[in-house]
Amino acid sequence: MAATLRELRGRIRSAGSIKKITKAQELIATSRIARAQARLESARPYADQITQMLTTLAADAALDHPLLVEHPQPKRAGVLVVSSDRGLCGAYNANVFRRSEELFSLLRDEGKQPVLYVVGRKALAYYTFRNWDIAQSWTGFSEQPKYENAAEIASTLVDAFMLGAGEGEDQQTNNEQSVDELHIVFTEFKSMLSQSTEARRMAPMVVEYVEETGPRTLYSFEPDATTLFESLLPRYLTTRVYAAMLESAASELASRQRAMKSATDNADDLIKALTLMANRERQAQITQEISEIVGGANALADAR
């Protein structure tokens, strides 16, 4: 019985130590998520406006750019998977990987070979363990991505897409490095309690032609539409990648805050249950000791 009591007290101490760690992680995530949300909210208007500008340019001008033209027989599709660098964030990464696998299956059904690009150590470890060929990876900034990180990633993706569009000097030589489509898998932040894993195509761009109810607005482009489009295009793709990483960063912190709060609450419940069991064991031990003392006293009295 004493051994059981010592074991219960040891488990209570262990649960208390774990609770301190999870509580600290919860507080850290809570303090960081406000900054992540602020960065996300400040970036969204710019991303929306540049998307609207490029859509207007493409819809109002006869542009023939590789990023607007569908490949006649797409064979390779680049997929950028945005994950986290650290764990302890619930099902955040598992949901990203599940959505990625769904996209890979869809691409294969369409006769396209997925070409994998990853952001975050978790995705790098996940796909390396499964012997995936990773075209390129970026790590170390999942919680606090910078615009420079997004620019580097977007540049790599655009270079691969341009090779697939026949912009390279030797298309046959560069075939293994080229892609005909660009997709991104990330986690969209909706609120502290709601995030959804999304898979979206970045290139070729999908131009939406919207019918105007009133008189049609005529635009005059200075410089010409093609020059303006090519000037804005790198910023557009970088902004798309940057916005996705900001969404994922806020989602990661929200998932970690929820996961750590749940772990802290579970530790509290476990400590209460173990404390109750320990008290019962202690009470039983005391009762047994009293019974032994009374029994010994009665035996001495009978002996007299």
Swiss-Prot record:
Highest rank taxon of the organism: Bacteria
GO BP, sorted A to Z: proton motive force-driven plasma membrane ATP synthesis
A GO molecular-function descriptor: ATP binding
CDD domains: F1-ATPase_gamma
Major location category of this protein: membrane
Cystine bridges: none
A Pfam family matched in the record: ATP-synt
Any one GO CC term of the record: proton-transporting ATP synthase complex
Record's subcellular location: Cell membrane
Keyword entries, A-Z: ATP synthesis, Cell membrane, CF(1), Hydrogen ion transport, Ion transport, Membrane, Transport
PANTHER family: ATP SYNTHASE GAMMA CHAIN (PTHR11693), ATP SYNTHASE SUBUNIT GAMMA, MITOCHONDRIAL (PTHR11693:SF22)
Similarity section: Belongs to the ATPase gamma chain family.
Physiological role: Produces ATP from ADP in the presence of a proton gradient across the membrane. The gamma chain is believed to be important in regulating ATPase activity and the flow of protons through the CF(0) complex.
Self-association state and partner proteins as the record states: F-type ATPases have 2 components, CF(1) - the catalytic core - and CF(0) - the membrane proton channel. CF(1) has five subunits: alpha(3), beta(3), gamma(1), delta(1), epsilon(1). CF(0) has three main subunits: a, b and c.
Protein name in the entry: ATP synthase gamma chain
Gene behind the chain: atpG
